[in-house]
C-alpha cells in the first residue's frame, strides 16, 4: 500500500515521502498513530501543492538573502568601545552587539546567530562573516575604535 508520511519515521522515511509499505503496517501502526495517510489522488494533489508552495517559499527566501548579501557586501560597521592600555576592551563585543549595530546603522534586521564571529576583545579592524542562508553568506568589515 502506498502511503504519504506525515512525520519522520526512523528506518522508514522522512515527512512528505511517498513510500510503499505492507497493508497491515499501514492500517495497524501508521494510520492510528497519524504517522501517515493513504496516497490516493486527492492526498497526492494536496502533497504536490504543499511541495510547490515550499519550493516557492524557499526560492523567495533565497532571493531575499542574496539581495541582502549584495546590500551588505563590503560595508564598514563602525563601533566604539572603552579600552584600556594595549588596546584591550573593557568587556567584549559579541555577535549580539554586532547584530544590534547592523540594525542601527544599516536598518537591516539580522539574527545574532547569523553573525559568525568570536568575541572581539581588542581595538582594530575585523572581517566578519554573516551567514544569511545555508548557501549564502557575505563579509563585512567591523572597525572597533576607542570612544
UniProtKB/Swiss-Prot annotation:
Gene Ontology molecular function, alphabetical? rRNA binding; structural constituent of ribosome
Q: Which GO terms describe its cellular component?
A: ribonucleoprotein complex; ribosome
InterPro entries per record: Ribosomal_bL9, Ribosomal_bL9/RNase_H1_N, Ribosomal_bL9_bac/chp, Ribosomal_bL9_C, Ribosomal_bL9_C_sf, Ribosomal_bL9_N, Ribosomal_bL9_N_sf
Q: Which Gene3D superfamilies match?
A: Ribosomal protein L9, C-terminal domain, Ribosomal protein L9, N-terminal domain
Domain of life (superkingdom): Bacteria
For this UniProt record, the keywords arranged alphabetically read as follows:
Ribonucleoprotein, Ribosomal protein, RNA-binding, rRNA-binding
Please give a single GO biological process term from the UniProt record: translation
Q: Does the keyword Isomerase apply?
A: no
Q: Which NCBIfam families match?
A: L9 (TIGR00158)
Q: What does this protein do?
A: Binds to the 23S rRNA.
Task: Supply the PANTHER family for this chain.
Answer: 50S RIBOSOMAL PROTEIN L9
Q: Which family does it belong to?
A: Belongs to the bacterial ribosomal protein bL9 family.
Q: What is this protein called?
A: Large ribosomal subunit protein bL9
Task: Give the originating organism.
Answer: Clostridium acetobutylicum (strain ATCC 824 / DSM 792 / JCM 1419 / IAM 19013 / LMG 5710 / NBRC 13948 / NRRL B-527 / VKM B-1787 / 2291 / W)
Q: Which gene encodes it?
A: rplI
Amino acid at each position: 500500500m502506498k502511503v504519504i508520511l506525515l512525520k519522520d519515521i526512523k528506518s522508514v522515511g522522512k515527512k512528505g515521502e511517498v513510500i510503499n509499505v505492507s497493508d497491515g503496517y499501514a492500517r495497524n501502526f501508521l494510520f492510528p498513530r497519524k504517522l501517515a495517510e493513504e496516497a490516493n489522488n486527492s492526498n497526492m494533489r494536496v502533497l504536490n501543492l504543499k511541495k510547490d508552495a515550499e519550493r516557492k517559499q524557499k526560492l523567495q527566501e533565497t532571493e531575499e538573502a542574496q539581495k541582502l548579501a549584495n546590500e551588505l557586501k563590503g560595508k564598514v560597521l563602525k563601533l566604539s568601545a572603552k579600552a584600556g592600555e594595549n588596546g584591550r576592551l573593557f568587556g567584549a563585543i559579541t555577535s549580539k552587539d554586532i547584530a544590534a549595530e547592523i540594525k542601527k546603522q544599516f536598518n537591516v534586521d539580522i539574527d545574532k546567530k547569523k553573525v559568525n564571529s568570536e568575541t572581539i576583545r581588542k581595538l582594530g579592524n575585523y572581517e566578519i562573516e554573516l551567514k544569511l542562508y545555508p548557501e549564502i553568506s557575505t563579509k563585512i568589515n567591523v572597525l572597533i575604535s576607542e570612544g
